[in-house]
Amino acid sequence: MEIKIVKTQNKKVKPEASTLGFGKYFSDHMAMITWSSEKGWHKARIVPFENLSIHPASTVLHYGAEIFEGLKAYRRKDGGVQMFRPMENVKRLNRSAERLCLPTIPEDVAFELLTKFVEVEQEWTPSNEGTSLYLRPFMFGNDETLGVHSVHNAEFVIIASPVGSYYKEGINPVKIMIENEDVRAVRGGTGYAKCGGNYAASTRAGKRAEDKGYSQVLWLDGVERKYIEEVGAMNVMFKINGKVVTPMLSGSILPGITRMSCIEVLKSKGIEVEERLLSIDELLDAMKSGTLEEAFGCGTAAVISPIGELMYDGVKYPVNNGQIGETTQMLYDTLTGIQWGKVEDTFGWVYKI
């Protein structure tokens, strides 16, 4: 595939690592490729970062025809740059596209554009511990007409942002409020797709939690309001009686790549993992009896986020005395070690630029 590359004439000043935060700064370029029902995917290019210009009737603005992904590039200790399981993001992007009637993109096309973009922008990958270059591929319907329909025009774009920790607490345990009013998704809906509407619908509950001093919410299922699903924008895992329990993928839960990686690491260490329904009653019993040993969220942005406190119906339940658990720390060390090239990648997960 031919990718036209136009380099910027006005390079930005790179921010200090201590100021990064998450998603505040953007690199010099962006990658794009256009799709139409007549031409298919065409016009692949890497161009200077700039605002997008779209028609006021563009499908994405009115009907939410949008999906996205999130992955990272890491600076290894030898100075090189690598990505973590990028092909899994490409595969998930296409599953999301199918759900929202957006065009799927050939895996080799998406992968080539992504890797070439990271090659061009690799100097934006920070080297300080805990930092990375966050990559945000996204696709949106761009028909210049009103009316609900499958799209005839779309854009696929990749932007990059040097980042530090997702949560201000970093790897320190966070406080989570169990949500029993709003729901994130329902089976048969778009819960398994990575689309903007899922996140927009979650912000009200997140704001309520934030106002009460909590970092995020723990979601219950949308039908019975009984079974645990996700925590904030992450998958969630609990260590109960020596076993790691995580909600099974049921159509309303995003199939996280970090989740999948955690399960593989845990099994390689001989730790039993159960993917199954986990009710709030079972979790409450485990908290009250002391058999809940650890709890943590897992996702690309934060990698592993230990949970130090859960609050339900006004009652606060400490988890592991508010400390990072042994299994939680092991997963964080293993995954970040592989990502930054400090630990041997025996799984074959990294792609070197």
Question: Predicted segment positions?
Answer:
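Helix-start/capping segments and mature chain N-termini
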Residues: 1-117, 145-353
